[in-house]
Amino acid sequence: MPLSGTPAPNKRRKSSKLIMELTGGGRESSGLNLGKKISVPRDVMLEELSLLTNRGSKMFKLRQMRVEKFIYENHPDVFSDSSMDHFQKFLPTVGGQLETAGQGFSYGKGSSGGQAGSSGSAGQYGSDRHQQGSGFGAGGSGGPGGQAGGGGAPGTVGLGEPGSGDQAGGDGKHVTVFKTYISPWDRAMGVDPQQKVELGIDLLAYGAKAELPKYKSFNRTAMPYGGYEKASKRMTFQMPKFDLGPLLSEPLVLYNQNLSNRPSFNRTPIPWLSSGEHVDYNVDVGIPLDGETEEL
């Protein structure tokens, strides 16, 4: 027991020491793995979709497979090599060009007479999506601003802005935008997504409509046996003829014409009234009252 005049000894706190050991104070932080810190909602969404452990991620993957199957089955000729050359003339004349191997689309804006060389281009993409082409040929005139590479990534759009045509090895700015689906019809006609609301094209209205074959209808309709022509010949029953007599108006009968004779259903202690006859009710008023007895 400490004396009243001396202070109590300070007890050693183990909780603070444990917290300092966990944090490490910068010395043991490398040995403690706290995991990856995710603060962006987009990273959380992409990670959940890639796990395939919940119902939403499975539906997302199935939807991607259905979209790819729909594009391939409904437009198989669009993604062939011959159709790419056919759609090339419908592209805008500012440097857009389609790829044949990877089914990509590159689009470049060239400055004064810049022409893409064979070694590199403004929108060239190889097997790796992060590969960027560099190096331009000698300055020319009338060349496209961007040229598609041989093995481009599917569903990519490359934007290139080369330097001047005199510079042999100029570095261009490459921006890659990944899209899941680009309609080849919108791409060929040059329709912007904002103009889809205003522009309505009915492709079925332009083609010649073939005459439909005249098949026999087997619907269950009330048709006589053999058709109407044979049934009219076999019909022997005829409706009998009869003369209609003159129409006579029926007399209007009114019951209880005198409304005063109608009974009243009010909740009053009034007896029923007869049909207009006077009725006298005899009520005995002088009823003898019996006196009280001794028992009461």
Swiss-Prot record:
Protein name: Myozenin-1
The family this protein is said to belong to: Belongs to the myozenin family.
Pfam families referenced in this protein's UniProt entry, alphabetically: Calsarcin
Lineage: Eukaryota, Metazoa, Chordata, Craniata, Vertebrata
Comp. bias regions, Gly residues: 105-117, 134-170
GO CC field: actin cytoskeleton; nucleus; pseudopodium; Z disc
Function summary: Myozenins may serve as intracellular binding proteins involved in linking Z-disk proteins such as alpha-actinin, gamma-filamin, TCAP/telethonin, LDB3/ZASP and localizing calcineurin signaling to the sarcomere. Plays an important role in the modulation of calcineurin signaling. May play a role in myofibrillogenesis.
Location of the region described as Disordered in the Swiss-Prot/TrEMBL record: 105-172
Keyword Membrane: no
Source species: Mus musculus (Mouse)
Assembly description: Interacts with ACTN2, ACTN3, FLNA, FLNB, FLNC, LDB3, PPP3CA and TCAP. Interacts via its C-terminal region with MYOT.
Keyword Phosphoprotein: yes
